[in-house]
Each structure stands twice: as C-alpha cells, then as structure tokens.
C-alpha cells in the first residue's frame, strides 16, 4: 500500500529477524509514522514479507504489525527503536511505558508513563539485569507457597503470550 503514502521511501536493505517462534524477513522502508498523538517523520521500520516460519496463530491471525519495545542492543540492522525515536524527539514525558491487561475490557499501552486509573499504591522498581531484553533478577519463584524454581532471571516480554523456562521446572 505504498502508493497511498506521499512520504514513503523505499530503503531496500533486506533483514532477517529470529523470534522465539521462528524467523521473519523482509526489507527496510521509511515513512511518517503517526499513532496516538505521536508523530515520527521519516521513521525507518521493517516491512515483513515472509513470516512463514512463524506458528499458525501468526499466519491466520489478523495482525498489522509488531511494535518493538526492546532495547537498541537487539534492534536488527542498527535501526532506532520506536521508544528511542520518541525520546529523541522529546514526545514522551518520561522514557517509560506501561501495559494494562484487562480481563473483561480492552487492554492499553501507555507510552511516556502509566495510567493511574489502572493501579493503586506505589511501584516497586527493580534494576535490569541486562539491557538486551527487559531482564530482571529473581529471588524465588513460588507456586502455592512452595519454591518451585532455581531460575534466577526472568524476561518481561510484551511480545509473547507464554511463560517459558527450564523444562524440568515448568512442566
């Protein structure tokens, strides 16, 4: 649908990204990207033209794309992330984001802060254990009050719908 945009620029550089569920590939392009009041002119993004390596849910689901919220260290091809571009353009009050995952209502992604209507009390901040993924150190994992895991790190990943870990501990 490039013809519908007067600001689209073909880059043509090819890429391949390996996700936990399989590879995707395509090429880079640039265009003005606008959403939720944010505006990023000449923003470089990846156009996926082969996602056949992903699971069936991705092939039959109705997706328009993926909004990467990871760190620069895992950005393929050195392309700046959406968060980095929003921070650099001073469009965010704070370089943070928050998710609200509703049970009976639509979820929300809040860029630049968190929506106080979705929580009460204070946040507990923990240091990141890595700046490749949103990794945090764990003291203990409990199930029904019993310690169940020797795993000492977790990755908080908004791009997956599953919990994963060592087979012997998650079965």
What do the predicted segments below correspond to?
Residues 1-58:
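Signature of the N-terminal lobe/flap region of pepsin-like aspartyl proteases
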